[in-house]
């Protein structure tokens, strides 16, 4: 083989297996994967204007935790009901408890996020998220329960998508039908049946306030033997929520 040909072949081989080219290729694959994931989220949320989500990422994780491979004899309790069949008392209680400015903000509150950032910086890790109802829904629909800044960034992106495609009433309807309210209990109808043996549309003020008070720690609320010292706080919080319900603005 002529010397010039051998040199060209060596240069071509060196170029083909250059570490920089491999790094560039891997980075390109990562970027393409991230973009594809965002497109999937975007189109999935667009479809939810017309159809209800059959489940959420958090529901599937909880079902696996509770049931494992025993899917035939084990399940979670979740029963979808339309927005107008959910008690206005529960809607007001959840707004009063979780996100008083829900109908006005664009899905997130800058002041709450900055406050959470300062608290997290002092602790050296993500311990508080400053989450609105839309942010909570974004996390439950698609994300894990891990606490780190990359996940928080993805949560904000999904929050924007939810607010882009869905009006506030639809966001709230999906939230009320998807949020965890106890061990394997998801959504307003399942919670109303589980705790009070009634329909979600018939919840009274006190019942609604108690359910709203449970949202930050629903498993503790449900399994009182594990959280007996916390239930007093639930009762106190329920009383506070009941007094604030009259000022809650609903997305009707």
UniProtKB/Swiss-Prot annotation:
EC annotation from Swiss-Prot or TrEMBL: 2.4.99.28
Origin: domain of life: Bacteria
Topology of the protein relative to the lipid bilayer: Single-pass membrane protein
Pathway(s) the chain acts in: Cell wall biogenesis; peptidoglycan biosynthesis
Cross-referenced SUPFAM superfamilies: Lysozyme-like
Gene Ontology biological process terms from the UniProt entry: cell wall organization; peptidoglycan biosynthetic process; regulation of cell shape
Residue spans crossing the bilayer: 23-43
Pfam families: Transgly
Catalysed reactions listed for this entry: [GlcNAc-(1->4)-Mur2Ac(oyl-L-Ala-gamma-D-Glu-L-Lys-D-Ala-D-Ala)](n)-di-trans,octa-cis-undecaprenyl diphosphate + beta-D-GlcNAc-(1->4)-Mur2Ac(oyl-L-Ala-gamma-D-Glu-L-Lys-D-Ala-D-Ala)-di-trans,octa-cis-undecaprenyl diphosphate = [GlcNAc-(1->4)-Mur2Ac(oyl-L-Ala-gamma-D-Glu-L-Lys-D-Ala-D-Ala)](n+1)-di-trans,octa-cis-undecaprenyl diphosphate + di-trans,octa-cis-undecaprenyl diphosphate + H(+)
Function: Peptidoglycan polymerase that catalyzes glycan chain elongation from lipid-linked precursors.
Family per record: Belongs to the glycosyltransferase 51 family.
UniProt name for this protein: Biosynthetic peptidoglycan transglycosylase
């Amino acid at each position: 083989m002529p010397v010039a040909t051998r040199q060209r072949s060596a240069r071509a081989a060196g170029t083909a297996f250059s570490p920089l080219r491999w790094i560039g290729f891997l980075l390109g694959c990562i970027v393409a994967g991230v973009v594809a994931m965002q497109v999937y989220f975007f189109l999935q949320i667009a479809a939810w204007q017309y159809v209800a989500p059959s489940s959420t990422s958090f529901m599937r994780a909880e079902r696996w935790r509770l049931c494992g491979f025993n899917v035939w004899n084990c399940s979670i309790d979740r029963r979808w009901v339309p927005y107008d069949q959910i008690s206005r008392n529960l809607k007001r209680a959840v707004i009063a408890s979780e996100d008083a400015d829900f109908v006005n903000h664009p899905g997130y509150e800058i002041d709450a996020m900055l406050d959470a950032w300062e608290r997290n910086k002092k602790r050296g890790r993500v311990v508080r998220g400053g989450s609105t109802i839309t942010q909570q829904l974004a996390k439950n629909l698609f994300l894990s329960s891990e606490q780190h800044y990359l996940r928080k960034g993805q949560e904000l992106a999904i929050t924007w998508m939810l607010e882009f495609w869905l009006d506030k009433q639809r966001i709230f309807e999906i939230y009320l039908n998807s949020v965890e309210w106890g061990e394997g209990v998801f959504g307003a109808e399942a919670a109303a049946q589980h705790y009070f043996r009634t329909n979600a549309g018939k919840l009274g003020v006190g019942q609604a306030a108690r359910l709203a008070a449970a949202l930050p720690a629903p498993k503790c609320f449900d399994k009182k033997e594990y959280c007996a010292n916390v239930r007093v706080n639930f009762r106190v919080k329920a009383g506070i929520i009941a007094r604030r319900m009259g000022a809650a603005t609903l997305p009707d």
